[in-house]
């Protein structure tokens, strides 16, 4: 689960981090009034979406004219913002953040992730702030400095000072950076973050550190104990198919191929996608129906897969370990009849009662292609998707 910038900054403020005064607004009039409440003669207005690259897409504006703020809000509210991190449809804009303008002398980067390699929370800092950190990591990895947080000792001030020296901070800025680092590290654990970014963390013309932006991703598995964070969820930013799948406890991720995949088990699902790719196909999704692949869940899975107009064929790959393949076959038949599937369906069953399951499919009278192996299934579904 991701948070909007204004939500991230509200958490930053709770932990004593320096952020701009700002208000998230639902209407153009609110945006104009927010500028008046903030005061001054220069403001920044930002579209609130779960995506980076807003500035290049026209979703950020610096202005000293309240009527320009009104025009900006009227233009974007209710529309979709398309950036390099969204699909071609973009993300809907429901709120505009109006903030005081900050005078910038230098831009830095500070972020943290749960690193699978070290199995620790790892902080990253760089002098290359305000740009795509992925490009920095790829082209000049030596400019990214890291601090690994030991879960037994927690974050330590010396780690902040080490990063601060590498960023070239002066003694005053070092103290500020240490406070920011310790606050972020504490916040990361307190709220079960999976990702945290301040890009840019700026040095103002007065020489102070300031959190100019904020990006936070939450571990979805921890939301049961994060009621406050869960209440911040904005469903309008979710993929509609992924949100629908979550209602039925289906793990679904939309992709851009034409072969729909329905599999039980995340590992088998990833392997299925790999073998479809190996045989020249492109998966349209990742979908794990889990161990309890009932008729109802299979039917919903078909509905979700087929809601993607790019899907030209569906591969159902089931290993009968927890469930019997004959029961799965009956569920597939019922789902195909209920949903009215119009594209070719290739089914590969293996495991408990696999042969009986294939017999059930053969006797159904439906146009379902039974595969003898995973390789055969991949070859068949790729051909079907190509209309061969």
Swiss-Prot record:
Heterotetramer of two alpha and two beta subunits. Binds 1 Mg(2+) ion per subunit. Keywords: ATP-binding, Ligase, Magnesium, Metal-binding, Nucleotide-binding, Tricarboxylic acid cycle. It is an enzyme of class 6 (ligase). Its cofactor is Mg(2+). GO terms for cellular component: cytosol; succinate-CoA ligase complex. InterPro entries: ATP-grasp, ATP-grasp_succ-CoA_synth-type, ATP_grasp_subdomain_1, Succ-CoA_synthase_bsu_CS, SUCC_ACL_C, Succ_CoA_ligase-like_bsu, Succinyl-CoA_synth-like. GO terms for molecular function: ATP binding; magnesium ion binding; succinate-CoA ligase (ADP-forming) activity; succinate-CoA ligase (GDP-forming) activity. Belongs to the succinate/malate CoA ligase beta subunit family. NCBIfam families: PRK00696.1 (NF001913), sucCoAbeta (TIGR01016). GO terms for biological process: succinyl-CoA metabolic process; tricarboxylic acid cycle. This is Succinate--CoA ligase [ADP-forming] subunit beta. Substrate binds at residues 264, 321-323.
């Amino acid at each position: 689960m991701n948070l909007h910038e204004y939500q991230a900054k509200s958490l930053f403020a709770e932990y004593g981090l320096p952020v701009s005064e700002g208000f998230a607004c639902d209407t153009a009039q609110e945006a104009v009034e927010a500028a008046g409440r903030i005061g001054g003669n220069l403001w920044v207005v930002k579209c609130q979406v779960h995506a980076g690259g807003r500035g290049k897409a026209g979703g950020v504006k610096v202005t000293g004219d309240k009527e320009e703020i009104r025009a900006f809000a009227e233009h974007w509210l209710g529309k979709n913002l398309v950036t390099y991190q969204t699909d071609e449809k973009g993300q809907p804009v429901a709120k505009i953040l109006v903030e005081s303008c900050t005078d910038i002398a230098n831009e830095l980067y500070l972020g943290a992730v749960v690193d699978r390699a070290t199995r620790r929370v790892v902080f990253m800092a760089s002098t290359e702030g305000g740009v795509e950190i992925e490009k920095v990591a790829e082209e000049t990895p030596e400019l990214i400095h890291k601090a690994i947080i030991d879960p037994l000792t927690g974050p330590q001030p010396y780690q902040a000072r080490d990063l601060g020296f590498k960023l070239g901070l002066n003694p005053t800025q070092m103290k500020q950076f240490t406070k920011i680092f310790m606050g972020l590290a504490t916040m990361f654990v307190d709220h079960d973050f999976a990702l945290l970014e301040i890009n840019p963390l700026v040095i103002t013309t007065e020489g102070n550190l300031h959190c100019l932006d904020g990006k936070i991703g939450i571990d979805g598995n921890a939301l049961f104990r994060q009621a406050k964070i869960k209440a911040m969820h904005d469903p309008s930013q979710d993929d509609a198919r992924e949100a629908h799948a979550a209602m039925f406890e289906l793990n679904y991720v939309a992709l851009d191929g034409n072969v729909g995949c329905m599999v039980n088990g995340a590992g088998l699902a990833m392997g299925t996608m790999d073998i479809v790719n190996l045989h020249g196909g492109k998966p349209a999704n990742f979908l794990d129906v889990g161990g309890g692949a009932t008729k109802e869940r299979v039917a919903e899975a078909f509905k979700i897969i087929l809601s993607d107009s790019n899907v030209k064929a569906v591969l159902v790959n089931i290993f009968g370990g927890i469930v019997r393949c004959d029961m799965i076959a009956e569920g597939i038949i019922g789902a195909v009849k209920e949903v009215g599937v119009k594209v070719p369906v290739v089914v590969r069953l293996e495991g408990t009662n696999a042969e009986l399951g294939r017999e059930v499919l053969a006797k159904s009278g439906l146009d379902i292609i039974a595969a003898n192996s995973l390789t055969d299934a991949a070859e068949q579904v790729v051909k079907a998707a190509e209309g061969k």
